[in-house]
Curated annotation (Swiss-Prot):
PROSITE patterns: ATPASE_ALPHA_BETA
HAMAP family listed in its UniProt record: ATP_synth_alpha_bact
Disulfide bonds: none
The protein, known as: ATP synthase subunit alpha
Family matches, as InterPro entries: ATP_synth_asu-like_sf, ATP_synth_asu_C, ATP_synth_asu_C_sf, ATP_synth_F1_a_nt-bd_dom, ATP_synth_F1_asu, ATPase_a/bsu_AS, ATPase_F1/V1/A1_a/bsu_N, ATPase_F1/V1/A1_a/bsu_N_sf
Protein localization: Cell membrane
Topology in membrane: Peripheral membrane protein
Predominant subcellular localization, coarse grouping: membrane
Amino acid sequence: MAELTIDPTTIRKALDEFVESYKPSDTPTQEVGYVATAGDGIAHVTGLPGCMANELLTFEDGTLGLAFNLDAREIGVVILGDFTGIEEGQEVRRTGEVLSVPVGDGYLGRVVDPLGNPIDGLGEIKTEGRRILEAQAPDVMHRHPVDEPLSTGLKAIDAMTPIGRGQRQLIIGDRQTGKTAIAIDTIINQKRNWESGDPKKQVRCIYVAVGQKGSTIASVKQSLEEAGAMEYTTIVASPASDSAGFKYIAPYTGSAIGQHWMYNGKHVLIVFDDLSKQAEAYRSISLLLRRPPGREAYPGDVFYLHSRLLERCAKVSDDLGGGSMTGLPIVETKANDVSAYIPTNVISITDGQIFLQSDLFNANQRPAVDVGISVSRVGGAAQTKALKKVSGTLKISLAQYRSLESFAMFASDLDAASKAQLNRGAHLTELLKQPQFSPYSMEQEVVSVWAGTHGKMDDLPISDVLPFEKGMLDYLDHNTDILKTIRETEDFTADTEAALDKAVEAFRETFVTSAGKPLVEKKPDEKHTTPVEQEKIVAGEK
């Protein structure tokens, strides 16, 4: 057997040649994790050491997940969608992306899920790009003060708690008090601006349904279609049957779609119906992921959940296009308790609230706005001149009426001034009633509120207030130019008031009450007022 000799020079030469000719493999590498446990919309995943917070992950069946908890040994993942097919041992892969949704005008008139996928059976949506869900809100220097009105078409709100473009106005109240009805009426009222074709007036609307019944969402869509409002509205639907993950991200999806329009100089109205359901979904996710519970078992960052969402609603500066996104968050209370955790959180974040009282709703006062607790902190600067002039005393008159009404229940005798105040308050309360899906124009609101606050209805039976108002508006529309003048100037001058006073008095003379009696008794003509003397006949005279 030949002796083996090792030559170091030969070995060194062979290694050098190998290193020079070596080419790394082009095969891509990918981190792979495995499902340790799964259930209730949550999965615990091992592996994936490079995973980032809020990164999108994909499961074997294509379902997406959101990396929520980054623990030492595993990742807590919120499953976005159906979680029944996810089982222990399945592979999980990173995407290297954060959650985003498609955006663009193609979303107008469509119903989508929280991932931006159409669910209305009308085909694919033509998009203009994507926008991440966790987008930063505009900073202070890029905001413009709220100074443009956003009319709801509801007399009680536009007169007493006005809303401006870029404002966050909370709608709060017990279940079945008309919260959604106010939001839908506000969307329908934007139709007049949309049909004008003026981009500065047009408002694109987004309705985010969180935790609602599927039949309720379908009913809202049908109402918007019948009113012709669906062409400028997008519905983001996350019904009660959806997973907690979908309910959690749905408001952020709607906000991302709206921000795309806002930063392009357009005006947006977004309704979150409702944030109580989103907070409950976030609570269930946090408890399943073993995050420490706080007050009412909500996690400690539930305030941040809503603040980072609602702070995106703003009117941006002219440098960024001058667009706006107005937010109408809805929160449900229990037994009219506005001091609960979520209501107080959202009240402190928003620019005002409209509180709907269940007692008023049950007494057929609809919209059931509680004047005493409802407020708009910044909307007054955006209110039109005309409406501001006529509604100055309305809120205080109604507040005094409420307090005097409770006192009058125990008082046997009232002075004339108190009786007059009670009478005026009762007529104003009746005047502010408004059926659903019948928004008023700004000029109609001005005339109605003026007539109520100036005693033009004080001598009417309560049941005739609304018929009188309807007849008065028809009379003014067909016989005068007063409504047109108010609409074009957005002001209520002394000359306009004098002409309106004369026209309303003329209508009062023609109005007949439900009892069949004229409101104003006609005075008999003067030529018939002098008595006719009988001719005297004296006997014996010729």
